[in-house]
Amino acid sequence: MSLLLEPSQEQIKEEKLYQQMGVSDDEFAMIESILGRLPNYTEIGIFSVMWSEHCSYKNSKPILKKFPTKGERVLQGPGEGAGIVDIGDNQAVVFKIESHNHPSAIEPYQGAATGVGGIIRDVFSMGARPIAVLNSLRFGELTSPRVKYLFEEVVAGIAGYGNCIGIPTVGGEVQFDGCYEGNPLVNAMCVGLINHEDIKKGQAKGVGNTVMYVGAKTGRDGIHGATFASEEMSDQSEEKRSAVQVGDPFMEKLLLEACLEVIKSDALVGIQDMGAAGLTSSSAEMASKAGSGIEMNLDLIPQRETGMTPYEMMLSESQERMLLVIERGREQEIIDIFDKYDLEAVAVGHVTDDKMLRLFHNGEMVAELPVDALAEEAPVYHKPSKVPDYYKEFLETDVPAPKVEDAKETLLELLKQPTIASKEWVYDQYDYMVRTNTVVAPGSDAAVLRIRGTKKALAMTTDCNARYLYLDPETGGKIAVAEAARNIVCSGAEPLAVTDNLNFGNPEKPEIFWQIEKAADGISEACNVLSTPVIGGNVSLYNESNGSAIYPTPVIGMVGLIEDTEHITTQHFKAAGDLIYVIGETFPEFAGSELQKLTEGKIYGKAPAIDLEVEQSRQKALLKAIRSGLVQSAHDVSEGGIGVALAESVISSQRLGAHVTLAGEPALLFSETQSRFIVSVKKDHQEAFEKLVKDADLIGEVTSDSVLAVQSQEGQQWIHAQTEELESAWKGAIPCLLKSKA
């Protein structure tokens, strides 16, 4: 829209044009009161993105305050581009997770690709070199042609961006449920390494210092992307394809290297990614955090399209752009560095002392707004909360143990379920070995990367079983954190901290807001008990399509520290003759389980219980045993229960088997009782291990016959399956489903 065609201030108010930008009548009245006048078109556009849920967290701020954010190792908590945790020796790990859900539903390749690009920029804007990317993905049932298309394109987008930029994509999770049919979830996590002295903040300090724009030119892609991400999906969402950004990983690679070089210069005062809301959020947030203001001349903004208006320039979410604040008089040093990488670096403004964002275009001031009103003073809503009727019903519903007539066939069917099946089809498209630091590749409980020049390594994972959260958000929230920590411990690492991605439906619906509140309560309690503070994250609400919400899906990203690479552990059995233990009791808990979905086609009932004190005790004991050199392999028991955990432990290049004896009914093989592990131990270490891990029960032995044999204590054979048969079912499921015609 040309400046001449933009509506007047009076038109904006009288015709309520602000509503099209997601601004309510009450919010418009607040804006008018703050300014003491009517906003113009550029100004209301700026307010609309800064006050969107995506940027302001106006519906979720009261919830986020519940999370523990401090800890002995925490160097930077929520509020910056990414959180930072000390790992000793003057080093720190930087990590964060973010969503790109709505864009990926409309334009899956670019939506996923730019999600990866954005989270990488958040990490290197802190001064860290990104070392790994993970992702947590949710789709509808893989029998749907539309879902197959979204799945293939999202994975291709992640691979296309990550592989080109040279950062390994090392892990994550993919789950499939009907509720994600119209609203897939694409959450990307990035992990980086930094020395303490290189930590940078996104702050515009120093009156008179230069504001510099670096990176790609600004186009019209992604305008109102932040607003789009704060709405429900509908049949009309397809029309908002222009709100999806377009990425260039080769440009990002150059930008990454240039920024890491600039960070070494003391001429750099502050740096921030132009992410959601682009130039608007980066300038307003950097000024607000520093207690300063910013003036910019928009005529100087590098543009790849002609005739762009101030509104378009400020709201564009074109990718691969950063905003820097440089010491006055030292601009050329920075320009020279970016020039070396063939990147533009342009002085576009300066820092002021009056806490105002002033924008000039063609010699005229086109916006004058208080930065704190934009960045810190968005309205905060305490939404009404209501217990859903379905939850009350589930509490009263008895869930009978499913009848398992043939345990072997049931196991094979479970291994073919897309949520359980091997994700090799996915990660084979990712370059997970680039930079050669990946020690444990995708396919185990957590990915592990060594830290060069030390004996240390980092373990990383993403986790969330949304079915449990649907049944009981508070219990499910606890389980999400506990399972992430379990996966970290099974790799030989001590859990350090959490980054969370809260994916929920429309918070204006009281039943949905109740889910958000309860899930946050569960996550907070688990983080407190397990000593894993929340150092940052993302909130993605309005994940609904045509009025139907996704399951509550607060994805937990977690990083752990391995002090000595000799302690690195994987889930695969290592040698015939090793003893197999299960840590933890098994109860008939099938609500929300893969077996329940397989046999009944739906999930219902009371979520599996979790005792966080027991969870912590078992994790500590297992980690101590691993660090003492007593454990050959460790695998957490999750979807599909002990049966699936045993199958996954025998499926490895060594083609080992396992002979196991269990108590109870065959269905218990597939119960999803929490806080359990499958562990293998050398016979020489039996006494020491049992002394250390009190909750461990000896259930069998690793064998060389490539057979998984499971029998009852009375000697009744439940399962006798060749490892090759299990592997074929597990590895072949997703490729087979993708080839099939619906």
Curated annotation (Swiss-Prot):
It is found in: Cytoplasm. Signal peptide: none annotated. SUPFAM superfamilies: PurM C-terminal domain-like (SSF56042), PurM N-terminal domain-like (SSF55326). It comes from the Bacteria. Pfam families: AIRS, AIRS_C, FGAR-AT_linker. One of its GO terms (biological process) is 'de novo' IMP biosynthetic process. CDD domains: PurL_repeat1, PurL_repeat2. Mg(2+) 2 binds at residues 122, 273. The keyword Ligase applies. Mg(2+) 1 binds at residues 98, 538. Its EC number is 6.3.5.3. It catalyses: N(2)-formyl-N(1)-(5-phospho-beta-D-ribosyl)glycinamide + L-glutamine + ATP + H2O = 2-formamido-N(1)-(5-O-phospho-beta-D-ribosyl)acetamidine + L-glutamate + ADP + phosphate + H(+). Pathway: Purine metabolism; IMP biosynthesis via de novo pathway; 5-amino-1-(5-phospho-D-ribosyl)imidazole from N(2)-formyl-N(1)-(5-phospho-D-ribosyl)glycinamide: step 1/2. NCBIfam families: FGAM_synth_II (TIGR01736), PRK01213.1 (NF002290). Monomer. Part of the FGAM synthase complex composed of 1 PurL, 1 PurQ and 2 PurS subunits. Belongs to the FGAMS family. This is Phosphoribosylformylglycinamidine synthase subunit PurL. It comes from Bacillus licheniformis (strain ATCC 14580 / DSM 13 / JCM 2505 / CCUG 7422 / NBRC 12200 / NCIMB 9375 / NCTC 10341 / NRRL NRS-1264 / Gibson 46). The gene is purL.
